[in-house]
Amino acid sequence: MNKYKRIFLVVMDSVGIGEAPDAEQFGDLGSDTIGHIAEHMNGLQMPNMVKLGLGNIREMKGISKVEKPLGYYTKMQEKSTGKDTMTGHWEIMGLYIDTPFQVFPEGFPKELLDELEEKTGRKIIGNKPASGTEILDELGQEQMETGSLIVYTSADSVLQIAAHEEVVPLDELYKICKIARELTLDEKYMVGRVIARPFVGEPGNFTRTPNRHDYALKPFGRTVMNELKDSDYDVIAIGKISDIYDGEGVTESLRTKSNMDGMDKLVDTLNMDFTGLSFLNLVDFDALFGHRRDPQGYGEALQEYDARLPEVFEKLKEDDLLLITADHGNDPVHHGTDHTREYVPLLAYSPSMKEGGKELPLRQTFADIGATVAENFGVKMPEYGTSFLNELKK
């Protein structure tokens, strides 16, 4: 008999809670995503996360300890060697990744682009981090006139290739992206995904078409999600979860436009009758505020998210479990624009916890979540991770 019929896992993308013991190896000494935001805001107002026990993990400005937290609380340390979204999420579901995905804040190495030019017969322009719309404004006309490929990246581990559909036919663009995917399987160039970014229109009025295609990497092994799906449990992926695992172990995928849309979809799944896992990623914290080093916007987004939690609490049933965590840090007052190597919070709550919660031992790997989910549903345990299911008392 499953202890919990439904587990709702929420990943607050990039919401770290202080430098990890190995932060120095990543250039991240002193990073502290929530702590620095709380200082910048002169106190974060997150009363619902505080009730669950956020301030019991660590007190921060505006976030204090409570006498009787509703949930169990601790922090988790990442075991894998990367600090990107895919590594964090794959570890959460029981994998250990010893090859970090590469990011290219200065653009891609010349050797890689030379090889891509040689294999595709087309010249490459761009080669820098940029927003898709900005790079089209800047280089779209040149691309049309020369037939070159616009190659660009972002703060994430991606290689994107943009071309006008009337200049480089879709079939050719997709073939080019497959070549780029092959080349970036090399460890030193390993990106999480290659993305075809076709566009149409005239200079000054370019638009990206829906013919985007992603060439992702499948997880390097089976995850707890695969085990759940193969045992006929539901795995409802909300936000970019399905993309992160390249659809592996997903039974239903719900796209989201924003954090608030993500919370709406979470409430929708709370209203659904299912047995298994609902897995939500809230990406705005990372994409809109962390990489852009905007502590004010980040703080406001955290407060908006917190204000939605009562709707979630209200709909949770006695045999539901809510797990809230993060996948890495992205301290908006830290130097650079990259993720930061931090501990992440872990909060666990069910309405059946009548006595309230208490501190759990520090988790040595994010995979403890996957192990807990696996044990609850009686599926094969991941190779990594220690379940804390039996420590959650009703």
UniProtKB/Swiss-Prot annotation:
<dbReference type="InterPro" id="IPR024052">
    <property type="entry name" value="Phosphopentomutase_DeoB_cap_sf"/>
</dbReference>
<dbReference type="InterPro" id="IPR010045">
    <property type="entry name" value="DeoB"/>
</dbReference>
<feature type="binding site">
    <location>
        <position position="13"/>
    </location>
    <ligand>
        <name>Mn(2+) 1</name>
    </ligand>
</feature>
<keyword id="KW-0963">Cytoplasm</keyword>
<dbReference type="GO" id="GO:0006015">
    <property type="term" value="P:5-phosphoribose 1-diphosphate biosynthetic process"/>
</dbReference>
<dbReference type="GO" id="GO:0005829">
    <property type="term" value="C:cytosol"/>
</dbReference>
<comment type="similarity">
    <text>Belongs to the phosphopentomutase family.</text>
</comment>
<feature type="binding site">
    <location>
        <position position="327"/>
    </location>
    <ligand>
        <name>Mn(2+) 1</name>
    </ligand>
</feature>
<comment type="pathway">
    <text>Carbohydrate degradation; 2-deoxy-D-ribose 1-phosphate degradation; D-glyceraldehyde 3-phosphate and acetaldehyde from 2-deoxy-alpha-D-ribose 1-phosphate: step 1/2.</text>
</comment>
<feature type="binding site">
    <location>
        <position position="339"/>
    </location>
    <ligand>
        <name>Mn(2+) 2</name>
    </ligand>
</feature>
<dbReference type="GO" id="GO:0006018">
    <property type="term" value="P:2-deoxyribose 1-phosphate catabolic process"/>
</dbReference>
<dbReference type="GO" id="GO:0030145">
    <property type="term" value="F:manganese ion binding"/>
</dbReference>
<dbReference type="GO" id="GO:0008973">
    <property type="term" value="F:phosphopentomutase activity"/>
</dbReference>
<dbReference type="GO" id="GO:0009117">
    <property type="term" value="P:nucleotide metabolic process"/>
</dbReference>
<dbReference type="Pfam" id="PF01676">
    <property type="entry name" value="Metalloenzyme"/>
</dbReference>
<dbReference type="GO" id="GO:0043094">
    <property type="term" value="P:metabolic compound salvage"/>
</dbReference>
<dbReference type="GO" id="GO:0000287">
    <property type="term" value="F:magnesium ion binding"/>
</dbReference>
<feature type="binding site">
    <location>
        <position position="291"/>
    </location>
    <ligand>
        <name>Mn(2+) 2</name>
    </ligand>
</feature>
<keyword id="KW-0413">Isomerase</keyword>
<comment type="function">
    <text>Isomerase that catalyzes the conversion of deoxy-ribose 1-phosphate (dRib-1-P) and ribose 1-phosphate (Rib-1-P) to deoxy-ribose 5-phosphate (dRib-5-P) and ribose 5-phosphate (Rib-5-P), respectively.</text>
</comment>
<dbReference type="InterPro" id="IPR017850">
    <property type="entry name" value="Alkaline_phosphatase_core_sf"/>
</dbReference>
<keyword id="KW-0464">Manganese</keyword>
<keyword id="KW-0479">Metal-binding</keyword>
<feature type="binding site">
    <location>
        <position position="286"/>
    </location>
    <ligand>
        <name>Mn(2+) 2</name>
    </ligand>
</feature>
<protein>
    <recommendedName>
        <fullName>Phosphopentomutase</fullName>
        <ecNumber>5.4.2.7</ecNumber>
    </recommendedName>
</protein>
<dbReference type="InterPro" id="IPR006124">
    <property type="entry name" value="Metalloenzyme"/>
</dbReference>
<feature type="binding site">
    <location>
        <position position="328"/>
    </location>
    <ligand>
        <name>Mn(2+) 1</name>
    </ligand>
</feature>
